[in-house]
Amino acid sequence: MNKTAIALLALLASSASLAATPWQKITQPVPGSAQSIGSFSNGCIVGADTLPIQSEHYQVMRTDQRRYFGHPDLVMFIQRLSSQVSNLGMGTVLIGDMGMPAGGRFNGGHASHQTGLDVDIFLQLPKTRWTSAQLLRPQALDLVSRDGKHVVSTLWKPEIFSLIKLAAQDKDVTRIFVNPAIKQQLCLDAGTDRDWLRKVRPWFQHRAHMHVRLRCPADSLECEDQPLPPSGDGCGAELQSWFAPLKPGTTKPEKKTPPPLPPSCQALLDEHVI
């Protein structure tokens, strides 16, 4: 798919996510065994876990938004990754949005993050823990140059390379979305150990954070996985195509209507939202 078409799809998905959503009305996880249902951009979750706010290895940003819920596998991944980072003396992991208590569509900012299997992680590792004020209004560190063609060399750190690599090497991770310029720098720095690069996918924005996505849990029978990324390290023509100028669109994007919910998610809404 060419980049013009992908950009249009991204815009449409973002527009759909801005529509009013009833999922915010569910303020606690739905009781039951953990089940991720549907697709990453059209689904929900039963039995979500709450990521503990207090941890010596990570800090949770924007807790007032209450987007720190996810499948137990996601909570364990965050704890596993942040422990590895801490043991290597790299700094504190900054956790952004996961999902809402029952997953589902956000009213803005995300098209995915609906099944409790996605998390945003800042691409900075402070040596000194952030204050409560900093966590509530975090300052993102834009690692990408203005022209979008490379990272800012003074901001790019070996620890950020290692953070992304550690996440990609995790057995439960299927994709990590970063800006194309960040993917390009990873390709340059990777050396001969390159298998993990397959999971790192270029995507629009993502200049200051990585978006980590886990595979569907084996016992979540209604969860819809994505196809695996193409074979190879993704550092060749596919990556370079992201730096080609977009062709002007010939039509205005139409407002996209969100697709019907999976039946189990609709039933969940019918039961828990008046």
UniProtKB/Swiss-Prot annotation:
Which Gene Ontology molecular-function terms are recorded? metal ion binding; metalloendopeptidase activity; serine-type endopeptidase activity
Alphabetical GO biological process terms: peptidoglycan metabolic process; proteolysis
Please give the start and end residues of each transmembrane region.
none
Residues binding Zn(2+) 1, per UniProt: 110, 113, 120, 211
Which cystines does this chain contain? 44-265, 187-235, 216-223
Q: What class of enzyme is it?
A: hydrolase
Q: Which residues does UniProt assign to the signal peptide?
A: 1-19
User: In the UniProt record, does the keyword Disulfide bond occur?
Assistant: yes
Which Gene3D superfamilies does the entry link to?
A: 3.30.1380.10
Q: Which domain of life is it from?
A: Bacteria
Q: Name one GO cellular component term.
A: outer membrane-bounded periplasmic space
Q: Which cofactor does it need?
A: Zn(2+)
Q: Where does Zn(2+) 2 bind?
A: 147, 150
Q: Where in the cell is it found?
A: Periplasm
Q: Which Pfam families does UniProt cross-reference here?
A: Peptidase_M74
Cofactor comment text = Binds 2 Zn(2+) ions per subunit. Zn(2+) ion 1 is bound in the active site. Zn(2+) ion 2 is bound at the dimer interface by residues from both subunits.
Similarity comment: Belongs to the peptidase M74 family.
The record's note on quaternary structure and interaction partners says:
Dimer.
The record's listing under NCBIfam families reads: PRK09429.1 (NF006947)
Q: What is this protein called?
A: Penicillin-insensitive murein endopeptidase
